[in-house]
């Protein structure tokens, strides 16, 4: 039987070394593959005292924390709250009411005809 054991996501000495070498001017401008090879050479060239100090710092380094996932119920509730349906505008209501008049036209022409009808109506009523 497998058991879930919470574990600290610790980092190793080499990972800490790579993090520290991020701003090394010798590595700037190199391709990623070349940068990895160069970092590896630099790490292998460290003396044992430096490696031991690096391992000690890596052991003391706080581990990366996993992000807690939100339960699905909370996500669904949040999505329901934020996505309230908007009331349709006057134009949308007009289009819905009059789109059937131009049933035989292709969709693009149908929308142009409804828009033209909307503009005519707006001119008649005196609205901008």
From Swiss-Prot:
Region of interest (Disordered), ranges: 60-87
Keyword annotations from UniProtKB, A to Z: DNA-binding, Kinetoplast, Mitochondrion
Localization terms from the record: Mitochondrion matrix, Kinetoplast; Mitochondrion matrix
Protein's UniProt keywords contain DNA-binding: yes
Biased composition (Basic and acidic residues): 65-76
S-S bridge residues: none
Function noted in UniProt: Histone H1-like DNA-binding protein involved in the organization and segregation of kinetoplast DNA (kDNA). The mitochondrial DNA of kinetoplastid protozoa consists of about 5,000 minicircles and 20 to 30 maxicircles. These circular DNAs are held together by catenation into a highly organized compact disk structure referred to as a kinetoplast DNA (kDNA) network. Binds preferentially to a specific fragment of minicircle DNA and is able to compact kDNA networks through DNA charge neutralization and condensation.
Protein family (similarity comment): Belongs to the KAP family.
Protein's name according to its UniProt entry: Kinetoplast-associated protein 4
Organism: Crithidia fasciculata
Species classification: Eukaryota, Discoba, Euglenozoa, Kinetoplastea, Metakinetoplastina
């Amino acid at each position: 039987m497998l058991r879930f054991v919470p574990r600290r996501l610790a980092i190793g000495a080499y990972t800490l070394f790579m993090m520290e070498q991020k701003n090394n001017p010798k590595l700037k401008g190199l391709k990623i593959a070349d940068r990895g090879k160069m970092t590896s050479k630099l790490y292998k060239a460290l003396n044992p005292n430096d490696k031991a100090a690096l391992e000690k710092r890596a052991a003391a380094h706080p581990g990366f924390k996993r992000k807690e996932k939100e339960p699905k119920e909370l996500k669904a509730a949040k999505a329901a709250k934020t996505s309230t349906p908007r009331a349709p505008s006057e134009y949308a209501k007009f289009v819905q009411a009059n789109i059937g008049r131009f049933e035989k036209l292709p969709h693009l022409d149908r929308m142009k005809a409804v828009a033209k009808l909307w503009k005519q109506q707006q001119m008649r009523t005196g609205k901008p």
